[in-house]
Amino acid sequence: MNHREIAVAISNDNQEVSVTETIDAIKNAGFKNVFIQWYNKDWNPSQEEQLKYVREQGLNVIFAHLGYQNINDLWLENENGENLVPRYINDLKICKENNIPMVVMHLTSKSVAPIYNEIGIKRLQKIVDYAESLDIQVAFENTKTKGYLEYVMDHIHNKNAGICFDSGHYHVYFDDELDFSKFKDRIFAVHLHDNDKSGDLHLIPFDGTLNWANIINNLKDNGYQGPVTIELCYRYDYLKDGINNFYKKGYEAAYKLQELFEKE
């Protein structure tokens, strides 16, 4: 049997360690696949340097998570909203140059966002069409507010457009409510992490209150074929154990999720 790949986020939000130490710990834990944050922020080392280091370590980049600065303006008739299109097109161009086959995008930020509308769809259509011309998949993520994924997937029909299912957001913001069947065969990516509903904690799976068997069954039943991708953040009580133990524990949790995927 071919096992699903296991992957992990390279987080720039980890505490008390550099991103280089994060990458080293990820490799030491046994991960071979990662996703990177391409947020166009003033990081040291920069996102370009991080990508170079990741590749030097022999790690495979499965997708880039694009930034979401001003993303609520996507739905507004203003200059910030218009500027999102060339920004994302430039990100896609860079991903193509670096052989990154998929990007993940948010559709909103914060708890209140402008209601979805045709203005945003027209902009997203340009972004998705350009990605399609580069043979790049675009996966839109469920964030804090319901309805956006359904609206976008109902209006954008390109084969390269799908969703990224985020388990933590599903638990704390969606109260475990999502009609997975609406996205059948369009689930391109996942962000698997846990919380106890007190916040978006990015805990290691099984350290919170998510029903993992239910989530994995929903993903399997609706055609998700991709890696077991966990999105962890090194902070809180995890700091006592050290970065290497954190990612080793994360790898073990991902392996348990892999076993759930393979269970008949």
Regions found by a protein language model. Name each.
Residues 11-18, 36-49, 71-74, 79, ...:
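Acidic-and-aromatic substrate-binding clefts and catalytic sites of carbohydrate-active enzymes
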Residues 29, 94-99, 127-138, 218-225, ...:
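A structural motif corresponding to the C-terminal end of an alpha-helix
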Residues 46-51, 81-88, 117-125, 176-179, ...:
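Charged helix-capping and loop-helix junction motifs
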Residues 75-162, 172:
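Active-site acidic/histidine proton-transfer and metal-coordination neighborhood
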